[in-house]
Regions:
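Core beta-strand elements of the Rossmann-like FAD/NAD(P) dinucleotide-binding domain
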Residues: 2-11, 245-246
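Glycine-rich loop(s) and the adjacent beta-strand/alpha-helix scaffold that form part
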Residues: 7-70, 271-276
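Fold-independent oxyanion-binding glycine-rich loops
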Residues: 10-11, 15-18, 53, 93-94, ...
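Short beta-alpha connecting loops at secondary-structure transitions
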Residues: 31-35, 72-78, 151-157, 262-271
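Short Gly/Pro-enriched turn/cap motifs at secondary-structure boundaries
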Residues: 37-40, 77-82, 113-114, 219-223, ...
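A glycine-rich dinucleotide-binding beta-alpha-beta segment and adjacent secondary-structure elements
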Residues: 181-264
Length: 276
């Protein structure tokens, strides 16, 4: 009913999760454009409480982010995925490639989207890259390209999240990419396919983009776990800006911040909020 209650205790354990449910904090610390798999309740309240107690926050710009999220609605926690098409190119808003798409691990993928202007990457491919008997995506319960690709793409095109064109130049114009740069990027990729000298060293799934129709899908990063937080002792006691223990205050779970204790490694027990 909104009544405030004061609870007195010898100690308090703050285990309020991360801030992946707060678009404001994700924009502040991580990305200009971002989606999230975090529950709506994980809004970073615990960080504000600890800052009020004098605990500085560190590594807040670290998070477990993945590539290829499609913003299908106004809710940044409701989205689709797209980056697994056979041989597809990752193109930024300047019409340029940024990585070896088939040789990228999760860290390279997240860095690619993080470094792209406005965190926007277009997944670009041609009809030649579609394998009829393959899944639309590499994971999940999707059917085959033959069954589900066309209706799914049509739904994205209607929402202004994907484009289809008969030529590379036409695709660039529809998406709003610099035509000369984009066509040169595709030409360089096709030359690499023909001569075995891909500009980014790619040697797998080298399928030339020679014949249309051509497609582009707008994608942004999506976050699963945020990895920053206050510093603490080995006993999970929170430290102030002088490195001294704030008496009676402990932290546990995602608010600890994986980056503070494990660098780029994922640590079990710090991402259980996504199970809610």
């Amino acid at each position: 009913d909104g009544t405030e209650t004061t609870l007195l205790a010898p100690a308090t354990v703050v285990c309020t999760g991360g801030y992946g449910g707060s678009e404001e904090l994700l924009n502040k610390y991580n990305f200009e454009n971002v989606l999230s798999t975090s529950p709506a309740c994980v809004t970073g309240d615990g960080y504000a409480w600890l800052e009020e107690l004098g605990a500085p926050l560190t590594n807040m710009d670290f998070c477990t982010a993945y590539a290829g999220g499609i913003p299908t609605s106004d809710d940044f926690r409701s989205f689709g995925y797209f980056n697994a098409t056979n041989g597809a190119l990752w193109i930024n808003t300047n019409g340029e490639r940024m990585a070896n798409e088939t040789g990228a691990d999760s860290h390279v993928k997240s860095e690619t989207w993080a470094n792209a202007p406005h965190n926007i990457v277009y997944t670009v491919f041609s009809s030649e890259m579609l394998i009829p008997d393959a899944k639309v995506f590499s994971t999940g319960a999707w059917g085959s390209v033959k069954e589900e690709f066309d209706p799914y793409m049509e739904s994205l095109i209607e929402k202004g999240l994907a484009w289809k064109a008969d030529t590379v130049e036409e695709l660039a114009k529809k998406v709003g990419l610099p035509v000369d740069t984009f066509t040169a990027t595709i030409a360089a990729y096709n030359d690499g396919c023909a001569n075995g000298n891909d500009p980014f060293g790619r040697t797998a799934q080298e399928v030339a983009m020679a014949n249309g129709p051509f497609y582009a899908v707008k994608t942004v990063p999506y976050v699963m776990i945020t990895c920053g937080g206050p510093m603490m002792t080995k006993d999970c006691e929170v430290l102030n800006s002088d490195g001294l223990v704030i008496e009676g205050v402990y932290i546990a779970g995602e608010i600890v911040g994986m980056a503070n204790v494990g660098g780029l490694n994922s640590i079990g027990g710090m991402g259980h909020g996504n199970c809610l």
